[in-house]
Regions:
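An accessory alpha-helical subdomain
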Residues: 164-268
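Glycine-rich beta-strand-to-loop/alpha-helix junction loops that act as flexible
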Residues: 8-10, 65-73, 170-171, 257-258, ...
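Conserved hydrophobic helix-helix packing surfaces used for dimerization/oligomerization
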Residues: 3-5, 166, 303
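Flexible gly/pro-rich beta->alpha loop and the following alpha-helix that scaffold active-site loops
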Residues: 66-91, 272, 276-283
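Glycine-rich phosphate/diphosphate-binding loop of Rossmann-like nucleotide-binding domains
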Residues: 2-39
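Proline/glycine-rich low-complexity loops and linkers
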Residues: 48, 58, 75-203
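Short alpha-helical segments enriched in small residues
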Residues: 262-448
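Glycine-rich oxoanion-binding loops at beta->alpha junctions
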Residues: 26, 30-55, 91-132, 339-376
Length: 448
């Protein structure tokens, strides 16, 4: 099943808003076996939207649109849809009731503009947007077998018309996500295969999509490719390997588009693991914080953090997981040296001699917070995130990280590069802190 996304809104094309919707939708659609072939962004402009719809329907079986469903004059998507599908707006009593209920505690939000939200295209199937006023609209061929209208004048044959769907979604990210999860994906799952599939689509076996992801760190991408070259060359043509490096972690994603079974792709992975064992983080596509949380809970152990240059970012990542209170005890944000000495017990002479950004300082920070909060593990960070503060000996991007464990304390210096922005440096520091922690806990993770 081929799909395309059209994102609608001037704000996307002037850089005011980043399109996060498409990335999220692409991942969800892929999980459902729906192949996304193209993403297009257009202005809030009638002609642009009509052209984008016509082009998308020439290629795809399902077209998703996001944005332009609000009540203001610049929100024209609903009106353009009416023109495209040859229909008109009518009042929907259920949508009206929903909107009144939505705003029952905010009566000032019910006005003549809000009232336009319960006007919907007559031929559309309407799905409820539980958290917003813009209903989800689904367009397809009519019960009479009428084909889609085409603004370019190109007739759509009956085979095309019987399979094409357009699903118009709100552009507000949290509304779109809830709409997809609660309404759109269940709708697609229950809509008949005959209604969704054209005769020229791929067979069921060919439509099967299987993904497996392996997390690797501590090796450059090029070196990894050389290491597994022989294994990669032996993969069947139905399995595609992608290298996806980001923030010091390489995701090896194996994708099967065909009749390869899960057992077959898992068998290939089993032969890969011994080759990359020195660099293996996890055998599933999990976040570092998920892996850390799982390992600590499995072992009944706890952790604390002492942060200088990362300023609480490490703490925020660790406690972002549900149930993290069972293993994450707390943090000391020791940005000023007085906090390092008075709370964490870093020796003043250490700071005077070696400086705040040094191996000895982060070791004492990690040991200090581990003792203070009575945890099994502790991580400490201290560095120069920039853009100022660097020296010849300690340039911007220099970060020391220490790990205090039941077996002792280790520290490592990282150079993330002076050209990176401050946020990038602190983000990399958090990533490396967790990567090294995972390897100390257990270098292979698979969550069942």
């Amino acid at each position: 099943m081929r799909a395309e996304i059209i994102t609608i809104g001037d704000e996307l094309l002037i850089g005011q808003v980043v399109d996060t919707n498409s990335a999220w939708m692409a991942e969800r659609l892929n999980e459902e076996g729906i192949s996304l072939h193209q993403i297009t962004s257009v202005h809030d402009d009638r002609a642009h939207i009509l052209t984008a719809l016509d082009e998308a329907f020439s290629r795809a079986d399902i077209v998703f649109t996001t944005g332009g469903l609000g009540p203001t004059k610049d929100d024209i998507t609903k009106h353009v849809m009416c023109e495209y599908f040859g229909t008109q707006l009518i009042e929907d009593p259920q949508v009206r009731t929903h909107i009144h209920e939505l705003y029952k505690d905010r009566p000032e939000a019910l006005n003549r503009l809000t009232a336009t939200q319960w006007m919907v295209p007559q031929t559309a199937t309407i799905l409820t947007n539980r958290v917003g006023s813009a209903p989800i609209m689904v367009f397809k061929k009519s019960d009479t077998g009428a084909a889609f209208s085409s603004p370019s004048g190109r007739p759509l044959n009956s085979s095309e018309a019987s399979t094409k769907h357009l699903i118009a979604l709100p552009g507000v990210p949290h509304e779109m996500k809830i709409a997809m999860i609660e309404q759109v994906l269940p709708y697609l799952a229950t809509t008949s295969e005959a209604d969704l599939q054209r005769s020229d689509l791929l067979s069921t076996a060919q439509r099967s999509i299987i993904h497996r992801t392996i997390l690797v760190s501590g090796i450059p991408e090029s070196k990894l490719a050389i290491l597994i070259e022989e294994w990669e060359n032996a993969l069947p043509s139905s399995i595609h390997l992608a290298y996806l490096p980001k923030d010091g972690i390489i995701r090896l994603r194996l994708s099967s588009y065909g009749d390869t079974t899960e057992q077959e792709i898992d068998a290939h992975i089993a032969t890969l693991l011994p080759i990359i064992s020195d660099y293996l983080l996890a055998t599933e596509d999990l976040s570092l914080e998920t892996i850390v949380g799982c390992l600590l809970k499995q072992r009944g152990m706890t952790i604390a953090t002492a942060e200088s240059c990362t300023g609480g970012r490490l703490a925020a990542v660790l406690n972002s997981q549900s149930g993290s209170s069972s293993y994450y005890i707390g943090s000391v944000i020791a940005y000023d040296n007085s906090v390092k000495t008075n709370i964490l017990g870093v020796l003043p002479e250490t700071l005077n001699t070696d400086g705040a950004v040094s191996e000895s300082t982060v070791r004492q920070m990690a040991e200090g917070v581990r003792t203070l909060l009575h945890t099994d593990y502790a991580i400490a960070t201290s560095g120069i995130a920039g853009p100022t503060g660097g020296t010849i000996d300690k340039p911007v991007g220099t970060v020391w990280i220490a790990w205090a464990t039941p077996e002792g304390t280790e520290a490592e210096c990282f150079h993330f590069g002076a050209a990176r922005e401050r946020e990038q440096i602190t983000h990399r520091a958090v990533t490396e802190a967790l990567v090294r922690l995972v390897k100390r806990l257990n270098n292979i993770v698979s969550i069942q």
